[in-house]
A protein has these predicted regions:
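C-terminal catalytic lobe of FAD-dependent flavoproteins
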Residues: 142, 148-150, 158, 218-241, ...
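Beta1/beta-strand and adjacent pyrophosphate-binding region of the FAD-binding site
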Residues: 2-14
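Flavin (primarily FAD) binding-site architecture
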Residues: 204-219
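Dinucleotide-binding Rossmann-like beta1-alpha1 core, especially the glycine-rich loop
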Residues: 47-128
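Core beta-strand elements of the Rossmann-like FAD/NAD(P) dinucleotide-binding domain
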Residues: 2-4, 191-201
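Glycine-rich FAD pyrophosphate-binding loop
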Residues: 23-44
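A conserved short coil-to-beta-strand element within the FAD-binding core of flavoproteins
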Residues: 168-182
């Protein structure tokens, strides 16, 4: 039976971040994901790297400070999938007085180290504003946007780059301690093939399933309760042509974002609803759709109805149960629990956390694990660049350089590759000399060469992996085109298997 230094269960942002950090410190690492990378919470976020302006109202100063500092780190680590964005906050004096917002924004500007992002300013909305005429004043500040699912993917690629192993569609069925080691058993969810490994340490980073894995997988008591809070978003054709996002204050004191997305759409979200069901079956309720439309329509001249919605998505945030009364008051901070057996076989479990602070969470996790591993390397991720991030400049400059190297690329295709794969685009394109070299076009310039790259280098096994997580081509491809992608994947996987055997 093979022995690993560390097995990480869960292929969301926290699992991938911890596995990458550990592999880079010289540990032999295996990460197991039961379905697909980022298939739950980590692909259903608002897609922001943000300090969390509203968390200041809940006195979450440590979390906000850490998150603010991390924005700049992540912009350098993944410049192909993360970029700065300005946020406009319309002033509604009956909800929060201007002095309170100014103090909040002053703290936001100064709590974290800010080197590249511009500070906050006041705004006057004139006759040409996209907002209703009664909204005359507001504020503007900086945060960042990120492709959440691809941030997870880049960390998984880093695990492999640093000598670790990543298995998707491989469900950990049990883990138990034996003679100072963990015995971990798993099965391939497609073939039923069984695996087992020994490990010197184990990480439970299963997100919404963290407590369930204690109960069913390890038969151990969970140190904390978990509260599942559902967040839903609606996607509509782009509601304005400005580059800025809007952050709207609602009557219930919550905030809702309106974020420009992929040049053609706006994301509106999120909700905060207690959730009791299966995290895999989460979907938006009619009441959430009405809530988001109402908040949006209260602010904007251009009105939206149910018919304008082109897509919706929902996810559950697995938050550490701090017995708060309302979903929005529960801390978004993370809790790391570690316990061992006579100084051996540590189990580190992750409760809570958010996309923005995943790298610090991983660093803290490794600090807790370090005493169990002699000769483990030091922290290293802060100065690292994630796979795809070596674009030397911004994404649009890189897209222009791609077109010079591959003149047959259309502007839109070069931009898609630059903003999706970054410096890995050249691996995808290889020696292609004409558009015909990219193979079949499944629709919306989604070529065979890209799908092949996704299977060979990004763990894609099903159409959804490719169309909704590694890319968002599902927004454009119709049912027939998506079915053709599925068919191609079946044929290509068969071909790969027969070559392997």
């Amino acid at each position: 039976m093979e022995t690993k230094d560390l097995i990480v269960i869960g292929g969301g942002i926290n699992g991938a971040g911890i596995a990458a950090d550990a592999a880079g410190r010289g540990l032999s690492v295996l990460m197991l994901e039961a379905q697909d990378l980022a298939c739950a919470t980590s692909s259903a976020s608002s897609k922001l790297i943000h300090g969390g302006l509203r968390y200041l109202e809940h006195y979450e100063f440590r979390l906000v400070s850490e998150a603010l500092a991390e924005r700049e780190v992540l912009l350098k680590m993944a410049p192909h999938i993360a970029f700065p964005m300005r946020f406009r906050l319309p002033h509604r004096p009956h909800l929060r007085p201007a002095w309170m917002i100014r103090i909040g924004l002053f703290m936001y500007d100064h709590l974290g180290k800010r080197t590249s992002l511009p500070g906050s300013t006041g705004l006057r909305f004139g006759a040409n504003s996209v907002l209703k005429p009664e909204i005359k004043r507001g504020f503007e500040y900086s945060d960042c946007w990120v492709d959440d699912a691809r941030l997870v993917l880049a960390n998984a690629q880093m695990v492999v780059r640093k000598g670790g192993e990543v298995l998707t569609r491989t469900r950990a069925t049990s883990a138990r301690r034996e003679n100072g080691l963990w015995i971990v058993e798993a099965e391939d969810i497609d073939t039923g093939k069984k695996y087992s490994w020994q490990a010197r340490g184990l990480v439970n980073a299963t997100g919404p399933w963290v407590k369930q894995f204690f109960d069913d997988g390890m038969h151990l008591p969970s140190p904390y309760g978990i509260r599942l809070i559902k967040g839903s978003h609606i996607v509509v054709p782009r509601v304005h042509t400005q580059k800025q996002a809007y952050i709207l204050q609602n009557e219930d004191k919550r905030i809702v974002f309106v974020i420009p997305w992929m040049d053609e759409f706006s994301i509106i979200g999120t909700t905060d609803v207690e959730y009791k069901g299966d995290p895999k079956a989460v979907k938006i309720e009619e009441s959430e759709i009405n809530y988001l439309l109402k908040v949006y329509n209260t602010h904007f001249k251009k009105q939206l109805s149910r018919d304008d919605i082109v897509w919706t998505y929902s996810g559950v945030r697995p938050l550490c149960d701090d017995e708060s009364d309302s979903p929005q008051a529960i801390t978004r901070d993370y809790t790391l629990d570690i316990h061992d057996e006579n100084g051996k076989a540590p189990l580190l479990s992750v409760f809570g956390g958010k996309l923005t602070t995943y790298r610090k969470l991983a660093e803290h996790a490794l600090e807790k694990l370090t005493p169990y591993y002699q000769g483990i390397g030091p922290a290293w991720t802060k100065e690292s660049v994630l796979p795809g991030g070596a674009i030397e400049g911004d994404r649009d400059d890189y897209a222009a350089r791609l077109r010079r190297r591959y003149p047959f690329l259309t502007e839109s295709l070069a931009r898609h590759y630059a903003r999706t794969y970054g410096s890995n685009s050249e691996l995808l394109l290889g020696n292609a000399g004409a558009i015909s070299d990219l193979g079949e076009d499944f629709g919306h310039e989604f070529y065979e060469a890209e799908l092949k790259y996704l299977v060979d280098h990004e763990w894609v096994r099903r159409a959804d992996d490719a169309l909704w997580r590694r890319t968002k081509q599902g927004m454009w491809l119709n049912a027939e085109q998506q079915s053709r992608v599925s068919q191609w994947l079946v044929e290509y996987t068969k071909q790969k298997l027969s070559l392997a055997s």
